[in-house]
């Protein structure tokens, strides 16, 4: 009797890989560990995925969806910042996965749901089309990412963590308020404007 295909196998593989990445980051994600956690064999894994990069791309997309679910509930600039930090701190390995080559993906114009949401939120608040606010959104994203990176540093004292968050929120709100009075344009015509 011929073997029947396991229709849920690919989903189990991605779930297993995501679990491994969430718990241990890149060092935990080996093809053997994924196969073992998904209750399959390494050759079966390679039949469905060429290499680790294929799996990482699916994991990145899932992490982006989870981050987007955090960000889309924001109802103010401050809330947007705080939700960003909450995601980064609660899901540090996923945050790393999303941002590892974010600038490269920006240049390739690959999907970045939370960044697109930020541009849309700026357009809703300031008027105009989302793409008109790409430069401001890029500046705000850099501000958020820099602050989140500092917050993810081991042993950050709570007082410093609070000060970093407060300073970032204040700078974020100031940039948005200043943009309300005039058009924010970066000094270059690079990928952020496309």
Question: What does each of the following model-derived ranges do?
Answer:
Residues 61-80, 118-120, 124:
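Amphipathic alpha-helical linker/stalk segments
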Residues 21, 55-63, 71, 98, ...:
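Alpha-helical DNA-contacting segments of helix-turn-helix folds
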């Amino acid at each position: 009797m011929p073997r029947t295909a396991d229709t849920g196998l690919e989903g189990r593989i991605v779930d297993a890989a995501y679990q491994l990445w969430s718990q241990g980051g890149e060092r935990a994600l080996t093809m053997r560990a994924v196969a073992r956690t998904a209750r399959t064999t390494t050759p079966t894994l390679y039949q469905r995925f060429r290499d680790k990069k294929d799996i990482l791309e699916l994991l990145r997309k899932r992490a982006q969806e989870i981050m987007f679910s955090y960000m889309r509930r924001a109802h103010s600039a401050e809330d947007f910042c705080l939700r960003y930090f909450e995601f980064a701190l609660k899901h540090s390995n996923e945050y790393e996965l999303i941002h590892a080559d974010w600038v490269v993906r920006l240049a390739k114009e690959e999907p970045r749901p939370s960044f697109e949401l930020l541009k849309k939120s700026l357009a809703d608040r300031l008027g105009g089309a989302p793409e008109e606010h790409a430069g401001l959104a890029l500046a705000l994203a850099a501000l958020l990412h820099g602050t989140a990176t500092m917050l993810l540093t081991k042993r950050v004292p709570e007082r410093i963590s609070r000060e970093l968050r407060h300073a970032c929120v204040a700078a974020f709100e100031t940039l948005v308020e200043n943009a309300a009075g005039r058009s924010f344009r970066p000094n270059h015509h690079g990928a952020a404007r496309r």
